[in-house]
């Protein structure tokens, strides 16, 4: 049985194992997929041991996406643009191929929600690996991107790096203009610690829609809870993005694209 996993820290909240087992059953693939807690001090050695033991591939989540990118010998174009990876595949020659399916997952979910229209103003909170992975697909979808981050220089660096792909600008977190954004995307990992980014509540109140890349099976994420408190009604967590990126990762590994619509139809048991 082929072995796969998702690496992160924390990782207990991950629904990736259930998703990939669902995909495997649906497509009649013989594989096992587990969640593994990465050690922030020993991650590279852990990952090396994982593949040395015969594993075929894995997903990478916070805080290891940029570190995993550096471990791979080959990269997809979208992965190179992000300098961050969420999917690794062991090739026949033993080398690691890195891909980033986060952007494809986000765009497909925004399309499913009918939230993706040309020339929208999208404010992205955070400038880490999660943001890097989605910028190129959003810019290719003709979105106008504004990035803010607690460390402003990181937002500036990203805006400079991606400005030849489309309209993108960095904003100081403490000086975001009070105006309506078509969509606010939370790409920070603060929710994993039960926290939220410190943002002026008026900005949330004026938002046409809010999307949190994080997700929670049991309750609202801290960011979604904050948005609801501010009266925002058009809200989505990142479960649909998780499903989309997982489907693209599964296709990379197995060569078959699973059907994801049943997961949102109400006719299947939710993952």
From Swiss-Prot:
Q: Does the keyword S-adenosyl-L-methionine apply?
A: no
Q: Which InterPro entries match?
A: Aminoacid_DH-like_N_sf (IPR046346), NAD(P)-bd_dom_sf (IPR036291), SDH_C (IPR041121), Shikimate_DH (IPR011342), Shikimate_DH-bd_N (IPR013708), Shikimate_DH_fam (IPR022893), Shikm_DH/Glu-tRNA_Rdtase (IPR006151)
Entry keyword set: Amino-acid biosynthesis, Aromatic amino acid biosynthesis, NADP, Oxidoreductase
A cellular component term from Gene Ontology for this protein is: cytosol
The broad enzyme category this protein falls into is oxidoreductase
Enzyme Commission number(s):
1.1.1.25
Reactions catalysed according to its record = shikimate + NADP(+) = 3-dehydroshikimate + NADPH + H(+)
Question: Which SUPFAM superfamilies does the annotation name?
Answer: Aminoacid dehydrogenase-like, N-terminal domain (SSF53223), NAD(P)-binding Rossmann-fold domains (SSF51735)
The residues listed in the UniProt record as binding shikimate, with positions renumbered to this chain, are 14-16, 61, 86, 102, 215
Q: From the Swiss-Prot or TrEMBL record, what is one GO molecular function term?
A: shikimate 3-dehydrogenase (NADP+) activity
Q: Which CDD domains match?
A: NAD_bind_Shikimate_DH
Residues annotated as catalytic: 65 (proton acceptor)
Q: Which residues bind NADP(+)?
A: 126-130, 149-154, 213, 238
Which pathway is this protein assigned to?
Metabolic intermediate biosynthesis; chorismate biosynthesis; chorismate from D-erythrose 4-phosphate and phosphoenolpyruvate: step 4/7
Q: What does this protein do?
A: Involved in the biosynthesis of the chorismate, which leads to the biosynthesis of aromatic amino acids. Catalyzes the reversible NADPH linked reduction of 3-dehydroshikimate (DHSA) to yield shikimate (SA).
Quaternary structure per UniProt? Homodimer.
HAMAP family on file: Shikimate_DH_AroE
Q: What is this protein called?
A: Shikimate dehydrogenase (NADP(+))
Q: Identify the species of origin.
A: Histophilus somni (strain 129Pt) (Haemophilus somnus)
